[in-house]
């Protein structure tokens, strides 16, 4: 079990749809297997799954989950939990330890939206900051996932998509697979 799953806490449909969609797309692009939403927002789930269908991969989204139940089940299966928060240990101070855990275990990464429930800090195995300053949760997730996987996340190949980018130094090249 070396999967990466995102748990998005407190998504507010009227306010956070775009950011939550970008959290999911960033996670997908950097190698996560799926995303759990504590809010039952089907439109965000459908939007992300449309992108996955078009561009490939097996990324999934489940909405309306209980964070306590998901964390408990994840840990029972042998995984560990990282909560991204500006109040945690700065990433350079705990990265090696987390990478060592990740060698044999899956990681659930908690990304908050609104005020994070206080029990999250105790449920997480690691409370990790990316800089101990307020900034974007999307940036924190991207930096954390890249560092966790030592840059290998950028080499992931997405199979089964309708579209594929052909890398080009100048211009744009996209091919249709169907």
UniProtKB/Swiss-Prot annotation:
Alphabetical UniProt keywords: Cytoplasm, Methyltransferase, S-adenosyl-L-methionine, Transferase, tRNA processing
Subcellular location: Cytoplasm
Species for this entry: Methanocella arvoryzae (strain DSM 22066 / NBRC 105507 / MRE50)
Role: Specifically catalyzes the AdoMet-dependent 2'-O-ribose methylation of cytidine at position 56 in tRNAs.
SUPFAM superfamilies the record matches: alpha/beta knot
Protein name: tRNA (cytidine(56)-2'-O)-methyltransferase
The UniProt record lists the keyword Cytoplasm: yes
GO cellular component terms attached to this protein's record: cytoplasm
Signal peptide: none
Main location: cytoplasm
HAMAP family in UniProt: tRNA_methyltr_aTrm56 (MF_00077)
Chloroplast keyword on record: no
GO biological process: tRNA nucleoside ribose methylation
Subunit-structure text: Homodimer.
Protein family (similarity comment): Belongs to the aTrm56 family.
Reaction catalysed by this enzyme: cytidine(56) in tRNA + S-adenosyl-L-methionine = 2'-O-methylcytidine(56) in tRNA + S-adenosyl-L-homocysteine + H(+)
PANTHER family in UniProt: TRNA (CYTIDINE(56)-2'-O)-METHYLTRANSFERASE (PTHR42197:SF1)
Binding site for S-adenosyl-L-methionine: 84, 112-116, 130-137
A single GO molecular function term of this UniProt record: tRNA (cytidine(56)-2'-O)-methyltransferase activity
EC number assigned by the record: 2.1.1.206
């Amino acid at each position: 079990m070396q999967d990466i799953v995102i748990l998005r806490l407190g998504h507010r449909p009227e306010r956070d749809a775009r950011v939550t969609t970008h959290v999911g797309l960033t996670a997908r692009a950097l190698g996560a297997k799926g995303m759990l939403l504590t809010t039952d927002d089907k439109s965000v789930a459908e939007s992300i799954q449309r992108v996955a269908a078009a561009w490939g991969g097996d990324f999934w989204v489940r909405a309306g989950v209980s964070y306590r139940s998901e964390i408990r089940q994840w840990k029972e299966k042998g995984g560990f939990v990282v909560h991204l928060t500006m109040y945690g240990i700065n990433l350079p101070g705990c990265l090696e330890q987390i990478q060592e855990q990740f060698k044999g275990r899956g990681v659930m990464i908690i990304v908050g939206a609104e005020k994070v429930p206080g029990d999250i800090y105790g449920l997480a195995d690691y409370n990790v900051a990316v800089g101990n300053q307020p900034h974007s949760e999307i940036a924190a997730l991207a930096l954390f996932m890249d560092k966790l996987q030592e840059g290998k996340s950028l080499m992931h190949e997405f199979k089964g998509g309708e579209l594929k980018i052909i890398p080009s130094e100048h211009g744009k090249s996209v091919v249709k697979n169907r």
